[in-house]
């Protein structure tokens, strides 16, 4: 959701404004729509010619013009304020720049030949950033580049001067006067290869200047110029000594070469920074920026999260500018804490928002019982899933409990089974989020509803290490320590105390970090009766050299450490060392092309389970041609099969065969008696 047309709430009336209509049906996919100021034309990306290109369409006449012809399409774009030109990001190979073929679209035949040639090409690797799970594998020599295109003449230009041919550039953004472009670049090699910096160049790509310097830029959304073009707002992860994880808006002053926070990282009464990462909610499509500046330059609007709610806040930039001390270090910012205002909040999950020139706001938001819909002024504009009204859905209860060490208040949620009956006990599943620096929120969870519909309760919560609860809550790598384990067990004990959960029939599951904690819990506690570990991390020592971020650690290698000492440090306390204590039925779900937690991590759990614990039911399901994000964006068949595997496992070992161990012991005794008989006969 890129922007809101001024005409969307014009004189045509409420009913006309709410009328849904299909704007494009030209390609297989269309995305990133942007309404021009006349309310008649719309820019968007369409792959009707094979790759995603920018089109401009007249919504009254349906006439359209293709603006770009990038060889491999456009990843994202932004129109200038005067709507005469656009800046784009595109993926290209070095030889395509050298041979001037960047703007030559390939025919299907040429593309097939090109892909075949690429498949045979050996990978040349010189940098640590050679693979990423989001790329679905290793890079094959491509880079992200930026350039411009004029809407009238369709003239396209690629920025290749001032080292920009060799430096990857992403998320370009126009200044309001159309003379400058801000973007994120990757200037480093080695272990810092994933670190981005903020850059500015002229509209023609000349006069490149680096603006940030190790400020912790989080380059997943475009930077934004202030109204007077004298500053740029970008998001940073502060380099705090306590190791806490909080994303904050930082204003870079282009006139004075200074920078400062725009909100106070110590004031957590309203929000915990900007956009605490949500734990894999039900979302689709490309995301727009989660922060936006008003046209008058007074306010910065941003999405935020606190205590399981995702809300919308704003901060006065001009007040912050006059009342904030200018600093040159990311850790020295001083700001008055009364600047942040809550704009929209409630028992909801605001996933996207857009504003028009009058600062009217449309949101995409969900809640526990409803997937995301469009909302405006407190009214729901769409109803995309009316079929849900035909099903009984389980509601959610929010609870708080004190941590075992008494140092924290813990938030957890409890989902009762559908058709819940009092005075009856039910099995339950503890679901652990990934991250770990994410937050479970009140959004629609199909997985939880599926478990509840089968007669199981669901327990989920935010143990220490989660975002949304302040810096102290997620400081010091606590998510990997005993505190997080204790917190998760505390969730279960608190839920069991409600009286309707059978403590002998509690299962546990989770993905990524949640899979790591699933393994850890069944190895170090006797609380659970069955487990499903998903896309798990098992051995942090081997993940150092196999995962796409294995070398990125919260505990960097001390200079005085030898490599062997470092690997031993990572291996110390590894969860596979507890495999002898894995005494519950275990299902392992893993994608074969997972580049974050490699498939070998699943094998390191499966193999010792079969060797050391042959009497324990253990099964591994591998999903081919899928990556770490399979349950969110994988093939639909695989997503359904993944859910079925998990639910079937818990139905079997928490409901149908909860006495499997007794039967196994009886069978073992019979086998032993038979062997003794054979020995006597022999």
PLM regions and their residue ranges:
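Predominantly five- to eight-bladed beta-propeller fold
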Residues: 1, 7-9, 91-147, 196, ...
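Short loop/turn segments that connect beta-strands within beta-propeller blades
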Residues: 4, 58-62, 150-154, 202-206, ...
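Cap/lid segment of the alpha/beta-hydrolase catalytic domain
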Residues: 383-498, 502-504, 511
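Non-catalytic accessory segments flanking enzyme active sites
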Residues: 1, 87, 119-127, 132-145, ...
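Active-site-proximal cap/loop segments of hydrolase catalytic domains
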Residues: 25, 461-682
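Conserved beta-propeller blade repeats
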Residues: 27-43, 71-95, 120-122, 132-137, ...
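Beta-propeller fold detector
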Residues: 19-24, 65-68, 157-161, 209-213, ...
């Amino acid at each position: 959701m890129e922007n809101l047309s001024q005409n969307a709430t014009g004189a045509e009336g409420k009913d006309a404004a709410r009328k849904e209509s299909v704007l494009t049906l030209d390609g297989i996919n269309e995305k990133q729509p942007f309404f021009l100021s006349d309310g008649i034309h719309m820019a968007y990306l369409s792959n009707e010619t094979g790759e995603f290109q920018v089109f401009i369409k007249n919504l009254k006449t349906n006439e359209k013009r293709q603006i770009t012809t990038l060889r491999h399409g456009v990843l994202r774009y932004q129109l200038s304020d005067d709507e005469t030109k656009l800046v784009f990001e595109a993926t290209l190979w070095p030889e395509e720049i050298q041979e001037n073929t960047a703007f030559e679209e390939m025919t299907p035949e040429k593309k097939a030949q090109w892909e075949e040639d690429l498949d045979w090409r050996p990978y040349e690797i010189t940098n640590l950033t050679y693979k990423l799970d989001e790329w679905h594998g290793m890079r094959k020599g491509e880079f992200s580049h930026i350039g411009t295109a004029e809407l009238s003449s369709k003239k396209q230009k690629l920025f290749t001067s001032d080292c920009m041919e060799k430096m990857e550039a992403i998320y370009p953004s126009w200044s309001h006067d159309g003379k400058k472009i801000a973007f994120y670049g990757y200037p480093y090699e080695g272990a810092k290869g994933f670190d981005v910096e903020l850059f500015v160049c002229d509209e023609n790509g000349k006069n490149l200047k680096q603006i940030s310097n190790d400020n912790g830029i989080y380059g997943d959304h475009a930077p934004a110029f202030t109204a007077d073009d004298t500053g740029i707002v970008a998001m940073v992860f502060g380099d705090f000594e306590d190791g806490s994880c909080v994303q904050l808006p930082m204003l870079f002053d282009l006139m004075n070469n200074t920078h400062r926070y725009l909100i106070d990282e110590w004031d957590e009464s309203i929000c915990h920074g900007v956009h605490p990462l949500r734990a894999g909610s039900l979302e689709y499509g490309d995301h727009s920026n989660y922060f936006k500046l008003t046209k008058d330059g007074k306010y910065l609007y941003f999405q935020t999260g606190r205590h399981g709610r995702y809300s919308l806040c704003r901060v006065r930039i001009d007040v912050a500018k006059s009342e904030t001390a200018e600093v040159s270090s990311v850790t020295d910012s001083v700001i008055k804490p009364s600047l942040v205002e809550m704009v929209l909040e409630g028992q909801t999950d605001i996933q996207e928002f857009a504003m028009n020139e009058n600062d009217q706001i449309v949101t995409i938001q969900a809640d526990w019982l409803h997937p995301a819909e469009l909302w405006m002024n407190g009214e729901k504009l769409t109803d995309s899933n009316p079929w849900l009204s035909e099903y009984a859905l389980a509601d959610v209860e929010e609870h708080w409990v004190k941590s075992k060490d008494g140092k924290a208040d813990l938030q957890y949620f409890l989902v009762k089974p559908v058709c819940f009956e009092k005075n009856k006990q039910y099995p339950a599943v503890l679901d652990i989020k990934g991250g770990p620096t994410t937050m479970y929120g009140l959004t629609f969870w199909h997985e939880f509803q599926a478990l509840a519909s089968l007669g199981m309760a669901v327990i989920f919560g935010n143990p220490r290490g989660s975002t949304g609860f302040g810096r102290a809550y997620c400081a010091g790598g606590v998510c990997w320590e005993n505190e997080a384990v204790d917190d998760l067990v505390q969730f279960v004990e608190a839920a069991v105390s409600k009286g309707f959960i059978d403590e002998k029939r509690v299962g546990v599951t989770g993905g990524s970090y949640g899979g790591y904690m699933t393994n850890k819990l069944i190895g170090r506690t006797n609380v659970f009766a069955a487990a499903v570990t998903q896309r798990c991390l098992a051995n942090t020592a081997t993940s150092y050299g196999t995962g796409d971020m294995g070398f990125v650690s919260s505990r960097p290698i001390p200079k005085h450490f030898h490599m062997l000492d470092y690997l031993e440090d990572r291996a110390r306390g590894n969860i596979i060392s507890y495999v002898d204590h894995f005494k519950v039925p275990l299902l392992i779900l893993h994608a074969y092309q997972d580049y974050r937690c490699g498939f070998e991590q699943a094998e390191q759990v499966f193999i010792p389970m079969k060797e050391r614990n042959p009497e324990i039911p253990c099964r591994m399901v591998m999903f081919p041609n899928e990556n770490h994000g399979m349950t969110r964006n994988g093939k639909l068949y695989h997503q359904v099969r993944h859910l079925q595997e998990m639910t079937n496992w818990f139905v079997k070992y928490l409901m149908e065969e909860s006495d499997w161990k007794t039967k196994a012991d009886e069978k073992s005794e019979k086998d032993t008696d038979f062997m003794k008989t054979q020995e006597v006969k022999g």
